Amino acid sequence: MNGNGLALVPKWYTVAQVASLLGYGESRVRMLIIGGDLRSLKDGRSRRILPEWVDEYVQMRASQAEPTWWSQ
């Protein structure tokens, strides 16, 4: 909450927050960033990830999903 009683919504996530959202470890998220699968920006010594970039990654992974044997 800020001084006006309004909840602040983060405009970006940290690597730890993205790892928690996706159920991954932080090292896996960093590897996704290094590999270019997940976009990020450098903020000092940290990396920041916009929520829409997380959505892009999830959509990309969903489009690569193989059909399951029972849906064929």
For each predicted feature, which ranges?
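Polyanion-binding surface elements
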Residues: 2-31, 60
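N-terminal cationic amphipathic segment used for targeting or macromolecule association
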Residues: 17, 38, 44, 60-63
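Intrinsically disordered, low-complexity regions enriched in Ser/Pro/Gly/Gln/His and often acidic
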Residues: 5-6, 46, 50, 62-63
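Major-groove DNA-recognition helix of helix-turn-helix-type DNA-binding domains
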Residues: 21-48
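A short, Lys/Arg-enriched interface patch at domain edges and termini
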Residues: 52-72
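General detector of folded, globular domains
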Residues: 10-12, 43, 47-48, 55-58
